[in-house]
A protein has these predicted regions:
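Cysteine-nucleophile amide-bond enzymes
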Residues: 1-131
């Protein structure tokens, strides 16, 4: 019981936002219009754990989310904004989120190359099976 409490406390602590600074190199609209299903959205996170990840990996990016798009059948948020990304969160686990969640964060798009239609479909089905 103590370990469960401690792990939840630590996850909440590490998920807290530190300094929110944005040096986004692309507009939200440009990212929204450019993303294609199965792209990976790299994110420069602003949580305490993101700072540690960036330091340890010597990378600008601390986080990644898979873009499945509005046709993927993910649930919409309470505000009606369609969930189009799937990511792993320290507190919530695997979750779907809207693109607007990263509206004011520095991001970059990575597009898979050399994957066939079967591979892309298998990846989408795998993600759905884990939700």
């Amino acid at each position: 019981m103590l370990m469960r409490w401690l792990s939840r406390w630590l996850a909440r602590y590490l998920s807290k936002t530190v300094l929110r600074r944005s040096v986004s190199t692309a507009t939200y609209e440009a990212i929204r219009d450019t993303l294609q299903p199965r792209d990976v959205l790299l994110v420069e996170g602003d949580a305490r754990i993101s700072v540690a990840i960036r330091y340890l990996t010597q990378s600008t990016w601390s986080h990644a989310a898979l873009y499945l798009g509005p046709e993927a059948g993910l649930p919409a948020g309470e505000d009606g904004d369609p969930h189009v990304l799937v990511e792993a969160d320290l507190e919530e686990g695997i979750r779907s989120i809207p693109l607007s969640f990263y509206r004011h964060v520095h991001t970059r798009i990575c597009r898979p190359v050399g994957l066939g239609t079967y591979d892309l479909q298998a990846m989408t089905e795998y993600v759905h099976s884990r939700m």
